[in-house]
């Protein structure tokens, strides 16, 4: 299976502290109706760090069930504990996910040899396609292009990378050094179009939670050779991208979906509601963009 185009890093609706299954299914259905190319449950945006393993398995299962094979599902299943990552990956595999998103182990800052050993263990104990997730702003570790290329060459289950550095020089080096057919997805909504121009394949997106049609449309326009339309959609999304990060993700995007009437805005600690000043900025931009 190839992974290209716009994948939404899905938020997880909560109600009374529990997963709101009905709202989650409705969000997934709306995403598919709006033309999204794929779904990513249990990532950073999905507040997976606040869930039990059982809850993560449930969220992935619901996503796979609701998608019904219409779009691929890449399930977040990473950890800084290799054994835990193996167990989460097995849960995702049992739930029917097409691949998993594997964050580079955070906090303990493994060496390149440690990263390779981590992904080899994952492949040996829970074999399925993996997308490596490089997000140094959250992990404290930047997997350099030569490290990603080493892992890609030595661990065949690692089929791609979500590059969230927003460093186009680094993205270019990853594309240059990794094997042919290795998928490179943006983890930064601001630089999706230039990443595509370098030879990347798509994005795992935050803003597509609220505008799946625009993000998938931009990726499709680029693939069709319509650069003018792709540029128009890029600039149409940029103001929304800015307010999506006015505070820590996923607080703004989840608040936006609440303003759009998709579900009740609720977070699990340590995340708290958007500050009033930020909420005013978000509301103004959603109105300016015609979303509310």
Curated annotation (Swiss-Prot):
EC number(s) recorded for this UniProt protein: 4.3.3.7
Compartments, as annotated in UniProt: Cytoplasm
Transmembrane region(s): none
Domain of life, source organism: Bacteria
Keyword Lyase in record: yes
BP terms from Gene Ontology: diaminopimelate biosynthetic process; lysine biosynthetic process via diaminopimelate
Subunit structure: Homotetramer; dimer of dimers.
Name this polypeptide is given: 4-hydroxy-tetrahydrodipicolinate synthase
Organism of derivation: Maridesulfovibrio salexigens (strain ATCC 14822 / DSM 2638 / NCIMB 8403 / VKM B-1763) (Desulfovibrio salexigens)
């Amino acid at each position: 299976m190839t992974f290209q185009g716009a994948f939404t890093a899905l938020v997880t609706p909560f109600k009374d502290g529990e997963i709101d299954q009905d709202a989650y299914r409705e969000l997934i259905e709306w995403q598919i109706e709006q033309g999204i190319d794929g779904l990513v449950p249990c990532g950073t945006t999905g507040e997976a760090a606040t869930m039990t393993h059982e809850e993560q398995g449930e969220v992935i299962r619901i996503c796979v069930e609701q998608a019904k094979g219409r779009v691929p599902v890449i399930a977040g299943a990473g950890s800084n504990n290799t054994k835990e990552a193996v167990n989460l990956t097995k849960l995702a595999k049992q739930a029917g996910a097409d691949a998993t998103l594997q964050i580079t182990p955070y906090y303990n800052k493994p060496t390149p040899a440690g990263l390779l050993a981590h992904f080899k263990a994952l492949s040996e104990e829970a074999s399925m396609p993996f997308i490596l997730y490089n997000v140094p702003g959250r992990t404290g570790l930047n997997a350099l292009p030569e490290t990603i290329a080493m892992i890609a060459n030595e661990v065949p289950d690692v089929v791609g990378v979500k590059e969230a550095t927003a460093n186009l020089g680094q993205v270019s080096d990853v594309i240059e050094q990794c094997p042919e057919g290795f998928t490179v997805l943006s983890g930064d909504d601001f630089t999706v179009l230039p990443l595509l121009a370098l030879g990347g394949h798509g994005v795992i997106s935050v803003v597509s939670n609220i505008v799946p049609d625009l993000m998938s449309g931009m990726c499709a326009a680029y693939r069709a050779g319509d650069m003018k339309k792709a540029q128009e959609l890029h600039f149409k999304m940029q103001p929304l991208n800015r307010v999506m990060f006015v505070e820590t993700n996923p607080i703004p995007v989840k608040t936006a979906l609440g303003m759009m009437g998709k579900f009740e805005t609720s977070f699990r600690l340590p995340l708290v509601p958007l500050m009033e000043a930020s909420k005013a900025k978000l509301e103004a931009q959603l109105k300016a963009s015609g979303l509310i």
